[in-house]
Amino acid sequence: MGYEAGNYDVIVVGAGHAGVEAALASARQGAKTLVLTINLDMVAFMPCNPSVGGPAKGIVVREIDALGGEMARNIDKTHIQMRMLNTGKGPAVRALRAQADKFQYQHEMKKTMENEPNLTMLQGMVDHLIVKDDECKGVVTQTGANYRAKSVVLTTGTFLKGRIILGDLSYSSGPNNQQPSIKLSDHLADLGFDLVRFKTGTPPRVNSHSIDYSKTEIQPGDDVPRAFSYETVEYITDQLPCWLTYTSLETHQIIDENLHRSPMYSGMIKGTGPRYCPSIEDKVVRFNDKPRHQIFLEPEGRNTQEVYVQGLSTSLPEDVQQRMLSTIPGLENVQMMRAGYAIEYDAIVPTQLWPTLETKKISGLYTAGQINGTSGYEEAAGQGIMAGINAGRKALGKEEVILSRSDAYIGVLIDDLVTKGTNEPYRLLTSRAEYRLLLRHDNADLRLTELGYHIGLISQERFQAFQQKKEAIEAEKKRLYSVIIKPTAETQEFIRSLGGSELKDGIRASDLMKRPEMNYESVVRLAPAETPLPSDVCEQVEIQIKYEGYIEKSLQQVEKLKKMENKKIPDRIDYDAIKGIATEAKQKLKEVRPLSVAQASRISGVNPADISILLVYLEQGRIAKIAE
């Protein structure tokens, strides 16, 4: 027999990386928010790699921070190492990556949530949704507690019908041997949602005391203090190194000899795995010409001896894993503390979502994270903050927010999911973004902080500091556009010392900065500012001036896109009434129900000819609609 347990504006189901961002975003907007999670000891748990950031993903973390989210602040307080990647490349692909103390990361995030006004945390498993007239009204837990809400966000990770597979052993489980969620998955199917079966995996963990580090290569963090959050002022300087080693031909031989025992190749695993994070057995089979593969040894925290063996994700039997490890330089006598495993789980087909992450089928129900078919903590957190923002705004009677592909990598991620769908765990890559020169690590605040402030997630104090930074950037750019550097003997000597060609005439400081050998620091040696500027202001000035032409070209492309985005497609349009559109295109348009012509043009199977016919039809104004 059920009972009424409470009323809230928003309920978030799950407290992983999507759930914590969703809950905090909702509560910080003023919505009374409840988080229900299977185990309160596992808030923001990292079941796989103990790291945050990397190419594209690191930019997402910055975007979450610019909007007012928590992931960046939390990793800045709890990392053991920080590195800027791709420093030898252009600003569009630079990205920050941090090794996390995974246990401290959990502890700090749970503390943040416990201290958040408007946020209640409860341990409990949700079995059903309360749905009436295609509207989600709340949830029911396995104990029969009925919690009512105006919006519900599902962030269930890999728990939906989770199944762990290790060799020929298979059992129902969430990650790290936690309870799986069985009934909720069946309930979603009963409600009419299309589900898919995906798979991911994790490598073994080994005892640091048993590693011979003299046979590995040290991978230290950066000497320059770095941070993900724009608010961080205190930097961790006591960093721990990671270590690099490689598989050997003997490792590959053991894998080849035991492929018949691999669940991936025996048919035990039915779910589709991540393309960009293959298992070691997959790598050995697919790249059999490679004599070795990189293995990174990553400490899981400051107060544990467990080391994550990155690059060795596997579901081979335990005895094979131990033999495999002993063939890797430095790991000959290693003690395996936890075996690697694969986990299968249910996810929903994400084309069943609007760009707000609300489901099309049931109003007031939102989904975020791995339930939407993505992989990665950062992708989950990016969806989480947007689902939390929109669930909170819907509950409070406010207009929902959609990030476009030109606004943020989060916008690219969500648009890809809801427009194209995915047939494998989706990973965000820089190559997925058309406007990556605009979506940089360094300018996330310039792109999104104003929006975060208007939503209510950025404080007045932080917003004022942001405005001062913007003004300082514009003032310094204006100065450099007007200052003329004359070809004095001293100037010519300095330019020659940098490998540049001498000036023929006076030149604007901004034009001099565009030379490949020049940067902001070298230009201000010749044209000093009245007072030294903060490093983040200097960085912005340099990038905006140096890449001015390319940035301008990208902005022109964005303007064209916006014109297409502004051509809205009416709700309930009857595509069958439009003559000339190909049958496949009609099927896809009816399935996705795009909100704009631009979104329609990105659907797989919809061709330019179909878009031209759609545009003509919309301009005629006589639009047939299907009955509600």
From Swiss-Prot:
It is found in: Cytoplasm. GO terms for biological process: tRNA methylation; tRNA wobble uridine modification. NAD(+) binds at residues 273-287. Its cofactor is FAD. It holds the Pfam family SAM_GIDA_C. InterPro entries: FAD/NAD-bd_sf, GIDA_C_N, MnmG, MnmG-rel, MnmG-rel_CS, MnmG_C, MnmG_C_subdom, MnmG_C_subdom_sf. One of its GO terms (cellular component) is cytosol. PROSITE patterns: GIDA_1, GIDA_2. SMART domains: GIDA_assoc_3. GO terms for molecular function: flavin adenine dinucleotide binding. Transmembrane segments: none annotated. Belongs to the MnmG family. Homodimer. Heterotetramer of two MnmE and two MnmG subunits. NAD-binding protein involved in the addition of a carboxymethylaminomethyl (cmnm) group at the wobble position (U34) of certain tRNAs, forming tRNA-cmnm(5)s(2)U34. NCBIfam families: mnmG_gidA. This is tRNA uridine 5-carboxymethylaminomethyl modification enzyme MnmG.
